[in-house]
């Protein structure tokens, strides 16, 4: 019996042990689940800040959770939280609430999530909380989770006020805006003396995109064909150390002395033979600024006087009464010395272009011409400006008759047509004579041309007429070029002078008919042929500007003459007129060869010819206007 009871007790003990083990297992399982649940709802991240550990709780918000508006008053605030699970979250708050119980006190909002109280204290001063999540409280709380107060939903972007929490270890300051680098033209402009800067106009350009226009043949010119059109400096030659020609306006010499307003609008009849000037009332002569001068009124005789001052006054300040009075005194002397018809003696301006190393050629031209010259200078550096100022301060003739206008480029081929247009725009008369800087005119040329301009004016001939000036070349020195046609022809017969380029390009000048010119005593008309490129006198207001797509060498001038012929110009050779090119060694140019430059210019010509035909064909479709190449055979050598 005893043995039986012992066995039965052992079984009971075993069952009790098993029951206790099962209970312990389920208790452990329950505790484990509770811990795991808490860990999934919150993460404690220690942060070392100012020598202390601060616990930051990161709320993992679900995209769509209904929030009772009575329990959580989230008032139109956008919370933007760019979370990248960075444990180093620096919160920089003016309130500096370091709550290790994960309680952040919020005056407006209490949000209970998984029994964790998060009280966010956001004061009205929009303090920045930088938790390495850069909380930016400029009335803005962005959380990439839109909280819509109307529906009490968190929708991944909350509008109105935004807090930016950026998980970057960057300070919360606004990065200064990067200024674009200065172009070379701006750098050059900043280096100019102040008195020159005042006279400069910058026109920013970028012309490389024009290469697309020439892609029709599958070949685009080299990049330097378009480079460099970065800025244009257009200046009047009012350097303080130079002498410059000034313009004066005699309006009504019997008017009130206080009427000193540079008025161009004279209702007087324009008549060059006005003899009613009252010299004693010279005090009413008004100084007229160059840039306000309208050449066409000057040409028609509206009493504008061009006057040269030889003492280098700065005319930019008309408030200097002493200077003005002195100028008027000198003008009175000039008026007394000259015949009234001489007041309007300047009818033509030479327009030319060059670089500073050839200023001596401009001086040689001015010595013979003794009339206005408008010069465009290709400027490459501040040193060129210095050379220009030295030249015009040292040479009285250069300073008296030449007006200089600056054109600055980067690295480019010589911008010949840009320079020509600049010189033409700034010419002091409507009629211009286009010359290269290597040419020397005879001393009588201006008056000879002016005579025929006056004939057209008196006859009220407004037709499109251009005067051809026969061109020659020689190895003589400028001082040895004869001033009379008789002596000039003698040198022609001795081969000391010869017609220009007849051997190199017969078509370029042969229409001038040099044989006929040698015996002519009256102007004679000539017939235009393609690629003819004479040196012309014409009214600039009647023509279009030179095409500035041309750079370097080739077709820049004859394409302009073709446009004038298509427009309807007639060409007349003047009997006593001539110019002589002084031969010189070929200039060195660091760039493409002349053949390459000419090839690139040919591409421009082949685009330009159809444009001109379309412009002047008056609605008719024509293959050619003269004997120029058609579009199909534009690249044929037979036409060049």
From Swiss-Prot:
Subcellular location: Membrane
Family matches, as InterPro entries: Nucleotide-diphossugar_trans, Xyl/GlcA_transferase
Record topology, Cytoplasmic segments: 1-14
Compositional bias per record (Low complexity), positions renumbered to this chain: 65-171
Transmembrane segments: 15-35
Residue numbers spanned by region Disordered: 63-184, 254-277
GO terms classed as biological process: protein O-linked mannosylation
Chief place of localization: membrane
Extracellular topology ranges: 36-640
SUPFAM superfamilies, alphabetized: Nucleotide-diphospho-sugar transferases
Keywords: Glycoprotein, Membrane, Signal-anchor, Transmembrane, Transmembrane helix
GO cellular component term, pick one: membrane
UniProt topology in membrane: Single-pass type II membrane protein
Glycosylation sites: 68, 410, 539
Molecular-function GO terms, alphabetical: glucuronosyltransferase activity; xylosyltransferase activity
Disruption phenotype: No visible phenotype. Cells exhibit normal developmental morphology.
Family that this chain belongs to: Belongs to the glycosyltransferase 8 family. Highly divergent.
Official protein name in the record: Glycosyltransferase-like protein gnt14
Organism whose genome encodes this protein: Dictyostelium discoideum
Lineage summary: Eukaryota, Amoebozoa, Evosea, Eumycetozoa, Dictyostelia
């Amino acid at each position: 019996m005893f043995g039986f009871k012992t066995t039965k007790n052992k079984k009971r003990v075993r069952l009790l042990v098993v029951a206790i083990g099962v209970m312990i297992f389920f208790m452990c399982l329950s505790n484990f689940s509770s811990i795991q649940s808490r860990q999934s709802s919150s993460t404690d991240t220690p942060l070392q800040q100012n020598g202390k550990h601060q616990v930051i709780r990161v709320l993992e918000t679900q995209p769509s959770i209904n929030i009772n508006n009575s329990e959580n008053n989230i008032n139109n605030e956008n919370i933007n939280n760019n979370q990248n699970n960075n444990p180093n979250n620096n919160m920089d708050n003016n309130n500096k609430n370091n709550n290790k119980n994960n309680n952040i006190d919020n005056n407006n909002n209490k949000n209970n999530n998984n029994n964790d109280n998060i009280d966010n204290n956001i004061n009205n001063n929009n303090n920045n909380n930088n938790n390495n999540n850069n909380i930016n409280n400029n009335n803005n709380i962005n959380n990439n989770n839109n909280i819509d107060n109307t529906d009490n939903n968190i929708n991944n972007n909350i509008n109105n006020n935004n807090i930016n929490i950026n998980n970057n270890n960057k300070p919360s300051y606004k990065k200064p805006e990067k200024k674009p680098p200065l172009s070379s033209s701006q750098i050059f402009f900043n280096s100019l003396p102040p008195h020159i800067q005042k006279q400069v106009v910058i026109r920013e350009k970028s012309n490389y995109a024009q290469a697309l226009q020439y892609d029709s043949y599958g070949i685009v010119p080299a990049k330097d064909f378009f480079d460099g059109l970065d800025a244009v400096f257009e200046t009047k030659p009012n350097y303080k150390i130079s002498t410059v020609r000034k313009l004066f306006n005699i309006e009504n010499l019997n008017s009130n002395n206080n009427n000193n307003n540079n008025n161009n609008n004279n209702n007087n009849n324009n008549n060059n033979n006005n003899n009613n000037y009252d010299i004693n009332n010279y005090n009413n002569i008004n100084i007229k600024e160059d840039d306000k001068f309208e050449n066409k009124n000057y040409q028609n005789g509206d009493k504008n006087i061009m006057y040269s001052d030889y003492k280098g006054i700065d005319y930019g300040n008309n408030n200097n009464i002493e200077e003005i009075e002195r100028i008027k005194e000198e003008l009175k002397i000039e008026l007394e010395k000259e015949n009234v018809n001489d007041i309007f003696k300047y009818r033509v301006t030479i327009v030319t272009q060059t670089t500073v190393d050839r200023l001596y050629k401009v001086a040689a031209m001015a010595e013979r011409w003794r009339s206005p010259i408008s010069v465009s200078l290709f400027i490459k550096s501040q040193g060129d400006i210095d050379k220009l100022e030295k030249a015009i301060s040292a040479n009285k003739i250069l300073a008296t008759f030449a007006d200089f206008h600056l054109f600055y480029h980067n690295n480019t081929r010589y911008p010949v047509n840009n320079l020509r247009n600049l010189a033409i725009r700034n010419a002091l008369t409507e009629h211009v004579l286009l010359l290269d800087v290597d040419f020397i005119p005879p001393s009588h040329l201006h008056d000879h041309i002016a005579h025929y301009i006056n004939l057209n004016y008196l006859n009220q001939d407004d037709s499109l007429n251009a005067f051809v000036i026969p061109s020659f070349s020689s190895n003589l020195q400028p001082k040895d070029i004869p001033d009379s046609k008789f002596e000039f022809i003698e040198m022609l017969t001795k081969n000391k002078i010869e017609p220009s380029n007849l051997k190199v390009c017969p078509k370029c000048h042969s229409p001038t008919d040099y044989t006929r010119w040698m015996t002519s005593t009256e102007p004679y008309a000539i017939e235009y042929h393609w690629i003819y490129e004479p040196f012309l006198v014409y009214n600039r207001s009647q023509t279009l500007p030179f095409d500035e797509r041309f750079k370097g060498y080739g077709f820049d001038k004859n394409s302009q003459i073709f446009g004038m012929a298509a427009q309807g110009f007639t060409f007349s050779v003047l009997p006593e007129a001539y110019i002589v090119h002084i031969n010189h060694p070929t200039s060195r140019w660091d760039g493409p060869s002349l053949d390459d430059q000419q090839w690139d210019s040919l591409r421009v010509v082949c685009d330009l010819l159809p444009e001109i035909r379309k412009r002047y064909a008056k609605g008719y479709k024509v293959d050619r206007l003269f004997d120029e190449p058609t579009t199909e055979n534009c690249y044929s050598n037979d036409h060049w």
